[in-house]
A protein has these predicted regions:
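Internal gly/pro-rich beta-alpha loop/helix module
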Residues: 165-284, 292
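A short helix->loop->beta-strand "cap" motif at the edges of active sites that frequently abuts
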Residues: 153, 220, 407-409
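Amide-donor transfer/coupling interface in amidating biosynthetic enzymes
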Residues: 2, 232-279, 285-288, 293, ...
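ATP-dependent carboxylate-amine ligase catalytic core
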Residues: 2-151, 159-189, 201-205
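Structural motif
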Residues: 12, 124-128, 156, 194, ...
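Phosphate-binding active sites in nucleotide-utilizing proteins
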Residues: 332-386, 390
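Cysteine-nucleophile active-site neighborhood
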Residues: 384-465
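Intrinsically disordered, low-complexity terminal tails and inter-domain linkers enriched
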Residues: 77-123, 180-186, 277-328, 461-477, ...
């Protein structure tokens, strides 16, 4: 796949480690760019939903997750090498291409594909890294540095200067000159450096003096010294404590903007990144007319609506004339989306749309039933444990789901969605009824039950024959890649006909972990979060089951 078009500047925010201040700096930069009238598309490296949700909330644009390991649909292997610089996997290239589009965040149907209207292209593609710059999976796969190298983007290095003086130079020099094996001897390209957790003006002077020889010898400038005192506070983003849609009103955009403008040389940073002076006005709509503050806030609120086809709009011709193979039996996927279910990768609607599906949303918390036009239901991850009483109280939804399951409607749940498909969840010793579609109970624990990259091989008869022209036993293995992160222990409820697993689960180095998931009839659930571009064959097969259900149940 060719490299991304260089006409849109891009920048990767990489840090010396976790808690270096990458997220506060990234969100501050997004606010400052908006205040300057610049349109940014943001993304997060790795599988983390939380920070990506904050990016989307502040920009009004869907925020992608970019990952160099999860984007490949293949069996894992200890001998698997990270791809060399410049070789972009097809899946990763598709995600990056979508970032080159400015989507309408205002709930209308408009949206311009990148290249058709320069004013509708983002001014900057901003990617926030995870952990330390070179931290990743096996042999560095999935690291922020590896991603930056593949995409050809420069890195702005965030240095945690807390409790550090002259040693900051040694830390910075190590990061600037490190040569990972996958880089083929080529260094990561650095745009500049920013120091965070600066204690005082005297501390700032010491850091500046210590880094001066390095900036002179490398040509990598020091672009900011961000003080610890007075830094804007962000709501906790730990799993299970807060959602972006709940925390957004508490985010002081003006404070974030002022903090980064006062302590960073943004003009130089943007010039080095190749960002042009914006032609659109701040707080303006597409016609250039000023937008009243109340209307602007309403539009930002609409940006929290569920991810649907409008997030990745097609051209008018594509929308009105889908491929001939999709016209007769275009499946309609009901996406569970409310406070309890919000962990959906931003690219999943695009992948489902490209595979021929249409998406509608519903709320297991509030609705009496899924939309009547649905031919399949998907329950993403989220926080069902925080909304267990409300989910348990909605008996109408539970009854409707049991009726649809009896008719054979395909249903699939991931992590939090899997919990909802079970009989019950126990929280702090108290049980709460869930939908009761799968013979499983679970209990929320205080420590992580599972964490890490995962590759999974689908059972031969699930979700559907992957190659209808072949015998089922001769079909090629269906592999997906994704991530697992949960605090929950599950318990099987014995049945005369036991549940069957969905996946054979492996870690990133190809070590077998366990048979994973539970399926009973047309209902299936698993702890695995499938990465959309690492599971296209799976979703294509699952959509076939939805189309078959539609054909069997509709005249």
């Amino acid at each position: 796949m060719p490299k991304p078009q260089p006409s849109i500047p891009g920048l990767v925010i990489g840090g010396t480690g976790s808690n270096a201040g990458k997220t506060t700096f990234t969100l501050s930069l997004l606010c400052a760019l908006h205040a300057r009238g610049l349109m940014a598309r943001a993304a997060k490296t790795g599988p983390d939903y939380i920070d990506a949700a904050f990016h989307a909330a502040l920009t009004g644009q869907p925020a992608a997750n970019l990952d160099t390991w999860m984007c490949r649909e293949a069996a894992p292997s200890p001998a698997e090498h990270p791809l060399p610089a410049g070789r972009i996997p097809k899946g990763l290239g598709r995600v990056f291409e979508r970032m080159s589009t400015v989507c309408s965040p205002y709930g209308d149907a408009e949206g311009v594909k990148a290249g058709t209207n320069p004013s509708a292209r983002p001014d900057l593609l901003l990617v926030e890294g995870a952990m330390g710059l070179y931290d990743g999976g096996h042999r560095g796969a999935g690291s922020t540095a590896h991603l930056a190298s593949l995409l050809g983007l420069p890195v702005l290095l965030v240095l945690n200067a807390g409790g550090m003086g002259q040693s900051i130079a040694a830390l910075a020099e190590g990061f600037l000159h490190h040569r990972p094996a996958w880089a083929g001897g080529l260094p990561v390209r650095f745009l500049g450096m920013v120091c965070t957790h600066v204690g005082s003006a005297r501390h700032a002077d010491l850091l500046r003096q210590s880094l001066a020889p390095l900036t002179k010898s490398t040509g990598v400038p020091l672009l900011g010294l961000l003080p610890r005192q007075g830094a804007p506070e962000l709501p906790s983003r730990h799993l299970g404590l807060v959602e972006a849609r709940e925390a957004l009103p508490a985010v002081d955009r003006q404070a974030l903007t002022q903090w980064v403008e006062q302590h960073c040389d943004l003009n130089r940073m943007l010039k080095l990144a190749g960002v042009r002076t914006p032609q659109r006005a701040v707080n303006a709509d597409t016609s250039g007319a000023p937008v009243p503050e109340a209307a602007r806030q309403a539009r930002l609120s609409e940006a929290h609506e569920p991810p649907s086809d409008r997030f990745f709009p097609l051209s008018d011709a594509q929308a009105q004339h889908p491929p001939r193979s999709q016209r007769r039996r275009r499946p309609v996927v009901g996406l569970a989306w409310d406070e309890a279910f919000s962990f959906c990768y931003a690219d999943l609607p695009a992948v489902l749309h490209e595979l021929g599906a249409r998406i509608v949303t519903f709320s297991p918390l509030r609705d009496a039933a899924p939309p009547i036009e649905c031919s399949g239901l998907y329950f993403p991850g989220g926080y069902p444990e925080l909304h267990a009483p409300g989910l348990a109280a909605n008996t109408g939804m539970r009854d409707a789901l049991h009726g649809l399951a009896a008719q054979g409607m395909p249903m699939y749940g991931e992590c939090g969605g899997y919990i909802y498909l079970m009989q019950s969840v126990q929280i702090a010793g108290q049980g709460h009824a869930m939908s009761g579609l799968l013979p499983r109970n679970c209990a929320l624990g205080a420590s992580k039950a599972a964490l890490g990259y995962r590759a999974a091989q689908a059972a031969p008869d699930w979700p559907a024959p992957t190659c209808p022209t072949l015998k089922r036993s001769a079909a090629p293995p269906l592999w997906v890649r994704g991530h697992e992160f949960h605090y929950t222990q599950e318990e099987e409820i014995p049945l005369p006909t036991p549940c069957r697993p969905l996946w054979r689960l492996y870690d990133s180095q190809g070590r077998f972990l366990r048979d994973e998931g539970c399926r009973l009839g047309s209902v299936a659930g698993s702890w695995l979060h499938c990465y959309p571009e690492g599971s296209r064959r799976f979703w294509r097969a699952w959509l076939r089951t939805c189309a078959a259900y539609f054909s069997d149940t509709r005249p």
